[in-house]
Amino acid sequence: MKALRNYLDKIKPNFEEGGKFHAFRSVFDGFETFLFVPNATSKSGTHIHDSIDSKRIMSMVVIALVPALLFGMYNVGYQHFHATGAAGGFWEMFIYGFLAVLPKIIVSYVVGLGIEFVVAQWKKEEIQEGFLVSGILIPMIVPVDCPLWILAVATAFSVIFAKEVFGGTGMNVFNVALITRAFLFFAYPTKMSGDAVWVSGDSIFGLGQSVDGLTVATPLGAAATSGAVPEFSWDMVTGLIPGSIGETSVIAIALGAILLLWTGIASWKTMFSVFVGLSLIHI
């Protein structure tokens, strides 16, 4: 890390006022503060110096999402192999899911961060770190069959109109990931609901098999259609059920929640209020 620090210090003058790459100062600052804690200090007032800044907080949230993301990748492969009847072991299922989910993560970050870089350059401000979390949340809350171009349009819409128009990270009144989901649901309802969007029916690099017209209902979808609550299954807890990429596993999500509580990033009061509010709605 010392060698990397020395290299950044060496090229930093090129991005400062008068340097040949001054126009890209915001981009450089964004990468530098992502890798290292800024050494800036306040000139007045009483402040507490803490090594945990907003980028570190966002990074910890991303780490907390990893269990649900990894399980979601496996579940994408599991649902495909299970629905198509194709033979495959754990690694075949995981690799299939990884290849199906990775393009969505790339599109989300490229579009969202691209817009934030452009806005930061235009406003001559530092790169804001809020999209570190939104960029991973967006692909986790959409069906695996959501087309990439639709995901790109929805991501661009939410970053611009739900975040940047309000001033950026910390000043937006809406959650970017949830606005993306809402935009997709109302603008492209056939790609976000029904029984044909939860399981991938395509073969990826020779893994799995292509099947036309593959339909699989989620437990809640089946309950809404039949009017009967599905019989309890531990698959609903472990997450081996159809659904959006990162939403199915209670265990994986709970692991992330425990990490956030243990590190002090999240409050149990906030989490508890979600369940209380949901319960009151159904009274």
Positions of PLM-derived features:
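Conserved small/polar residues in nucleotide/adenosyl-binding loops
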Residues: 281-283
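Long hydrophobic alpha-helical segments that form multi-pass transmembrane helix bundles
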Residues: 170-254
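C-terminal ends of transmembrane helices
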Residues: 42-48, 112-123, 160-170, 255-263
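Alpha-helical transmembrane segments in multi-pass membrane proteins
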Residues: 60-68, 104-116, 131-135, 139, ...
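Structural signature of hydrophobic alpha-helical transmembrane segments
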Residues: 95-108, 145-153, 241-249
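Generic transmembrane alpha-helix motif of multi-pass integral membrane proteins
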Residues: 116, 134-144, 254-260
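Membrane-interface helix-loop-helix junctions at boundaries between adjacent transmembrane segments
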Residues: 126-205
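N-terminal signal-anchor module of multipass membrane proteins
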Residues: 1-105
